[in-house]
């Protein structure tokens, strides 16, 4: 990335909060001056008395490289590139290689009270590995991308009516070396790409890859917003990881933290001796619950810093979207604060009008300049119109995590099945608001830590019931309206909670139950990806119809999902360990049901109760439906049926079936499934686990 110097208009945009490429005018950049290669450094420190550039190249001496103040509060200096070469005395720097670059630097800033403090570059493209905190000069240009086809296709990508199935992961704990050290970006690519492709995920979401000083923060307390973390290698190696995923047909979302930043002395806190990035009043500038500072979006320079950062990761790293963390804390001044601990806005309300304006500007800019990407809000309140267009008064996000659905579902599955009938509303209430936003259904990292138990261990009962309940939950989730997200380890039934400082327990795949649930997830992913009824209409009642919503006594729900061509899939879930060999359901039209997926099948570790033939409906009214039939409903299981409707008298064209997902070919039609007989076993051996290298 070459530096050409900002124009007056560009500087004005920076201060107004509309500059989306502020990283081109600030930070460290290679330049050419009179034929000589140089490095240009620029930092915004409007209230500083003096600023010096310090680093290995000048033995961290603040007297050697003073910077000059520009009229708008930035400080600049330009040095020959050879300044950063080890030349005459490599031993002086403890470097055995005389060609090594002296890349580390900081800004030494004098406050108005005369004190000095060393700060990392807010716009630095690389940083040292923790516990060291210096920035590193790094030229991002020169990487040769191989994902041109992906990037071109993304311009016309419509995620709202496409399958979106996200594998959320933490790069530092997915897998590690035997000695406990991190895999590099390159090593992660070698193992992750084939695994995700084999499992059938459409996207992967990386928890924050921006530099952060504390592993325990999981990356959510960022110190280097423009720097890929050095834990796993160089920035261009992260580019190569994303490139490899794109070439395999897998999208990449990045977690992004624009709400708050840590109080580390080397970071943004009181950057020039005064609050530059945070609000000066702690009632707005502090977040006591997290021990961090909140960004002050009333400042134009802060707006440009974060707007540019969002665009930076989409442009330079080819990210396919950002999952925006802690949006609720940005929207509300009273988030996690008691009365008296926050200041109202100018109208007396609790809404942060400046942050709301920033989010709208950011989404408008991103969707204009990067068509086909996904902007996802982690927003946990009932704030309206998060995913509605800005011109209608919305925030302009593409998707929002459905935290209400997630909390209800996890509370429900923790209950002993005996008591679930008293909480049946937790299964059905989500449809009261399911189409008010564009939702993602998240079983994320936050739900498998801090004593909440793993997805498997949340299930009550013995091991068989735990695994059966988990498979039933995954089957139900895949059919529920909304895009999907599952945190790593959940796909094979990780038994203990997630640990950020250790790899997943991959050895569990040596035990039969875990590869069986992994195979179940793989099959569900395949069905979801190839069945338009499950993803084409996630945003209206046109794609969903309750078949059985009120059977609380049996804790059974059933519903139809329908695609734009009228093809329907019936989902039936039994949340108790009671087997129902003849369960009567109503249907809106005469037709044929054919079981195409069943979490109770033997190959997934189930009891192998299923519907062995095509089932014809009968003209017998049940509830509000004129037609009905009996089906076999296994214990703690989800069953999918293709629903081939007979043509109505006024229709000349027969509705199509969904042939892509039929596991069991239709046999001789039977009116009921009163005496289901098991098919011959497909395999008597153990389930195969998915290889991860």
Model-derived segments and spans:
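Substrate-binding/active-site clefts of carbohydrate-active enzymes
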Residues: 128, 148-164, 170-350, 615, ...
């Amino acid at each position: 990335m070459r530096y050409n110097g900002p124009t007056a208009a560009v500087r004005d945009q920076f201060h107004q909060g509309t500059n989306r490429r502020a990283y081109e005018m600030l930070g460290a950049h290679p330049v050419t001056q009179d034929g000589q290669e140089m490095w240009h450094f620029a930092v915004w420190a409007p209230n500083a008395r003096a600023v010096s550039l310090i680093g290995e190249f000048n033995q961290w001496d603040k007297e050697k490289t003073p910077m000059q103040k520009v009229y708008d509060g930035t400080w600049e200096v330009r040095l020959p590139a050879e300044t950063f070469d080890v030349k005459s005395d490599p031993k002086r720097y403890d470097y055995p290689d005389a060609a090594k670059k002296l890349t580390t630097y900081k800004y030494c800033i004098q406050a108005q009270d005369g004190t000095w403090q060393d700060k990392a570059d807010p716009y630095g493209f690389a940083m040292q590995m923790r516990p060291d905190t210096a920035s590193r000069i790094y030229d991002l240009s020169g990487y040769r991308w191989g994902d041109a086809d992906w990037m071109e296709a993304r311009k016309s990508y419509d995620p709202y009516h496409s399958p979106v199935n996200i594998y959320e992961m933490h790069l530092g704990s997915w897998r590690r070396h035997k000695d406990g050290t991190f895999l590099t970006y390159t090593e992660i690519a070698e193992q992750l790409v084939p695994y995700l492709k084999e499992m059938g995920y459409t996207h992967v979401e990386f928890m924050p890859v921006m530099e952060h000083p504390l592993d325990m923060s999981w990356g959510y307390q960022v110190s280097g917003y423009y720097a890929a973390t050095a834990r796993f290698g160089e920035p261009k190696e992260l580019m190569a990881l994303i490139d490899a995923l794109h070439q395999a047909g897998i999208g990449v979302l990045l977690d992004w933290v624009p709400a708050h930043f840590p109080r580390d002395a080397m970071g943004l806190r009181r950057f020039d001796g005064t609050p530059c990035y945070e609000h000066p009043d702690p009632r707005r500038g502090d977040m006591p619950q997290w021990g961090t500072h909140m960004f002050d979006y009333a400042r134009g320079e802060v707006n440009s810093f974060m707007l540019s950062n969002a665009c930076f990761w989409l442009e330079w790293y080819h990210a396919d979207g950002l999952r925006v963390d802690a949006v609720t804390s940005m929207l509300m001044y009273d988030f996690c604060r008691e009365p008296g601990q926050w200041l109202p806005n100018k109208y007396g309300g609790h809404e942060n009008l400046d942050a709301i304006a920033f989010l709208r500007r950011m989404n408008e800019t991103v969707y204009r300049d990067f068509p086909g990407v996904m902007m996802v809000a982690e927003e946990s309140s009932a704030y309206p119109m998060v995913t509605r267009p800005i011109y209608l008064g919305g925030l302009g996000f593409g998707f929002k995590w459905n935290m209400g659905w997630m909390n209800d579902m996890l509370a429900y599955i923790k209950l002993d099945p005996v008591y679930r009938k008293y909480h049946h509303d937790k299964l059905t209430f989500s449809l009261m608001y399911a189409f008010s936003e564009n939702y993602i259904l998240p079983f994320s990292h936050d739900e498998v830590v801090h004593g909440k138990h793993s997805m498997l261990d949340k299930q009550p009962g013995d091991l068989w019931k735990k695994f059966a309940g988990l498979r039933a939950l995954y089957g139900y989730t895949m059919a529920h309206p909304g895009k999907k997200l599952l945190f790593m380890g959940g796909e094979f039934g990780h038994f203990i909670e997630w640990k950020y400082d250790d790899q997943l327990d991959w050895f569990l795949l040596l035990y039969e139950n875990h590869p069986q649930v992994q195979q179940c997830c793989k099959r569900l992913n395949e069905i979801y990806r190839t069945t338009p009824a499950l993803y084409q209409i996630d945003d209206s009642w046109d794609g969903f119809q309750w078949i059985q919503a009120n059977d609380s006594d049996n804790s059974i729900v059933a519903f139809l999902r329908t695609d734009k061509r009228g093809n329907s899939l019936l989902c039936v879930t039994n949340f108790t360990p009671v087997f129902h060999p003849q369960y009567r359901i109503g249907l809106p039209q005469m037709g044929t049901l054919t079981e195409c997926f069943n979490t109770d099948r033997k190959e997934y570790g189930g009891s192998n109760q299923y519907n062995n033939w095509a089932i014809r409906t009968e003209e017998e009214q049940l509830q509000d439906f004129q037609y009905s039939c009996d089906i076999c409903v296994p214990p703690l299981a989800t069953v999918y049926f293709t629903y081939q409707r007979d043509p109505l008298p006024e229709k000349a064209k027969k509705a199509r079936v969904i042939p892509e997902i039929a596991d069991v070919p239709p046999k001789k039609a039977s009116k009921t499934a009163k005496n289901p007989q098991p098919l011959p076993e497909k395999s008597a051996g153990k389930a195969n686990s998915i290889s991860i290298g």
